[in-house]
């Protein structure tokens, strides 16, 4: 595996470039560790309209506007199969854990889906976040904070 650059430094450079075109900047911070995602939120606070984490497939309940106007949520969640694990069939994931052998994760052909998202409203002039709402649809059940 090759070396990777510092996402905080690179993100700051990309924001500088993007600001030449728009003040509305969304950062999808793809990481495993919640503390790294939170650090990104605070680091980019006031420079990005929103910082939302992805990767864990589990929607967090911490949507908020940070001190300098950046919308933040540790993890948006996922879109996938509802009655499974990480959007996959529970049987394939359980087989992986119980046999400790590599297993191909599968998705069912039918079944209820799940959609996780956030709705972010920004100020037209400044690009700062005015509101962030969590959206979750599980089968026929709709939740919105």
Predicted feature residues:
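Short beta-strand/loop segments at the ligand-binding rim of alpha/beta enzyme cores
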Residues: 20-29, 47-51
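A short C-terminal boundary segment appended to hydrolase-like catalytic domains
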Residues: 94-145
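Binuclear metal-dependent hydrolase catalytic cores centered on His/Asp/Glu-rich metal-binding motifs
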Residues: 1-24
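Conserved beta-sheet core of the metallophosphoesterase superfamily
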Residues: 34-105
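Short, small-residue-enriched loops and turns at beta-alpha junctions
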Residues: 1-2, 33-35
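Divalent metal-coordination and catalytic microenvironments
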Residues: 26, 55, 120
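Short, structured patches in soluble enzyme cores that scaffold and shape functional sites
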Residues: 29-31, 136
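Conserved active-site and cofactor/substrate-binding residues in soluble primary-metabolism enzymes
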Residues: 2-10, 39, 92, 112-115, ...
